[in-house]
C-alpha cells in the first residue's frame, strides 16, 4: 500500500488537472487514456461491477412517454431504445462555423445594442431603488430552520457571512438560475420590457407581466417548427442533454423543434454559454435570435426545461397577481438589492389560461431565493405543508405542461375527450388524455401501477385503519421506485391519513426542498401539485381529504432510505376536525369567507 500511495497521488493529481484544465472533452479523454491508462482500467472495472443492471437512472415518465429523468444531470449517452430519435430534426455540427461565430458575438450582449443595454440597466436600477423604499425593513431572522438563531451583533453577522459564502457553491448547484445577475436571476429583459415593468410599478406598485407573455408578437407559431441553433460553445454531450429537454417539451405539447446551425435567417432559439443560466422571454418581435445561456452548472434537464420555458414565453410562478393567497413574501429577509425580484403582476393583465397557482411549478422560486443570508426564508407558503414543494427543478409539473398546451395547442385536436381526474385531451395524441401524475389510461380512469416495486393501487376504506408503506419498509427502499395510491372513502365521507413510526426521505434541509418525497393530493383537483413530505422527522398532524378521494404519491428520484408508513381510514364528515385539515379547497373556502366578512 505504501508503494501504491505515491503512484495514486500522482495519478489523481494528473486526472483532476486534465479535467479542470479546459472545456475540450475529447482532448481531455485522449490525454487521460495516454497518461493514466492504469487509472482508466481500474475505473472501467469498478464502473462495470457497480453499474445497476436495471438501468435505474432511467425513471418512469408519469406522462406516458419515454424520456430520461429530469433528475439525472450526468447523462453521457442515451440508449436508442429509451429515447425516440425522430421527434427533433437535428444535424450535429462538430466544428465552429462562420454562422456560429456570428451567434457567439451576438450572444455576448444577448443580441442587444449598447444603447439598449444602458436603457435596461437604467430601468432596473430604478426598479431596485423603488422596491428598496417600499420595503425598508431591517433584516430579521424569522421562519428559518430550527438551527437558525437571531442575529444579535456584528460578530454573529460575520459568522453568518462566512457560512453564506461557504454554501454558495451548493446553492448554485441546486437552483443555479436564481443566482444570475439578471432580472429575477435569469430573465434577460429588452428595453421595452424593462420600461413597461417600471412604468407599471410606478403607477400600480406592481409589474404588468404574467406567467405567460400576452403579446402575440412574442409568441412562437405553433404550426411551424421552432428553429434552434448552437453557437459552438457547448460540448457534444451538453448539446445532447439540451436536446433531450427540447424533446421532452416536444413529447408533451404540440410544439416541434428543428435544428439549423448553418444559417442566421428566421426567428430562432440560440443556445450559448455566455453568462450562467439566462434567457429572454418569448420570441424576439423583430425576428432576431432569442438567446438562451446555459453554463456547465445549468446542464441539468430540469434547469434547461425552465430556461426553455422562458424562451417560449413563461415568466415565474410566484409573480402571479394571486400569489398573496398562496405565499407570503418575507421582505425583511430579502437581500436589499434584490427586492425588485419579487414584484407582482396586475390582475387585469394576466394570461394564466385559467390554470390555478401551482406550488410545484418548475417556474417557482425556492423558499430561500435571494435571501440576505442562506438560512432566511424569503417565501413562506400560506399552507405550511407546501413549504418543501416550492422550488423544485426535477420535472415540469402537470400544470406547467397544461398551460403551455392551453396557449399553443388549443386547436390541435378536433374533438375533446371526456378526461377524468383533471386530465385533458393530449395535443400530441388526440385519441388519448394527458393525465396528472398518478393516473393512466385513455381517459385517466386507472391508477398508475408501481414502478420498480409492487406497490400502490386503489384502496377502498372503512372506519378501520389500513396501512400503506414505502417499498420494503422498515428496510430501505431503492432509488427510482414509484408508488401511487388512490384512497377512496364511502360516499359522504372523507379520507384521513396520519404518519407514524420512522420516517426518512432525502431532502435538502438547508434549502427546505424535497428531493425524494411522499406527496399527498387532497383537494378536488388532482391536477394540482400536492403537499410533499420528506427529510427525517415524522409529520405530526393528520391530513384530511376535501372529497371522498385522496391521492398519495411516493417518488424516489435520488437515493434510497427508510421511507414511511402511514395509517389511512374513512371518517364521517361529522367527525371532521378543521385543525387537522390541510387542503387547498378548505384554504380557498376560508379565504372567500374572510373576503366576504371584510367586505
UniProtKB/Swiss-Prot annotation:
Compartments (UniProt record): Secreted
Superkingdom per UniProt: Eukaryota
Residue stretches making up the Peptidase M12A domain: 211-410
Keyword Protease: yes
Keyword Nucleotidyltransferase: no
Cofactor: Zn(2+)
E.C. designation(s): 3.4.24.-
Keywords (A to Z) from UniProt: Cleavage on pair of basic residues, Disulfide bond, EGF-like domain, Glycoprotein, Hydrolase, Metal-binding, Metalloprotease, Protease, Secreted, Signal, Zinc, Zymogen
Domain EGF-like span(s) in chain numbering: 405-445
Active-site residues, record numbering mapped to chain: 307
Sequence ranges assigned to domain CUB in this UniProt record: 455-571
GO cellular component, one term: extracellular region
Residues making up the signal peptide according to the UniProt record: 1-22
One GO term of the biological process aspect: proteolysis
Activity regulation details: Inhibited by marimastat and tripeptide hydroxamic acids.
TM region(s), chain numbering: none
Residues that, per the record, bind Zn(2+): 306, 310, 316
GO molecular function, a single term: metalloendopeptidase activity
Protein name: Zinc metalloproteinase dpy-31
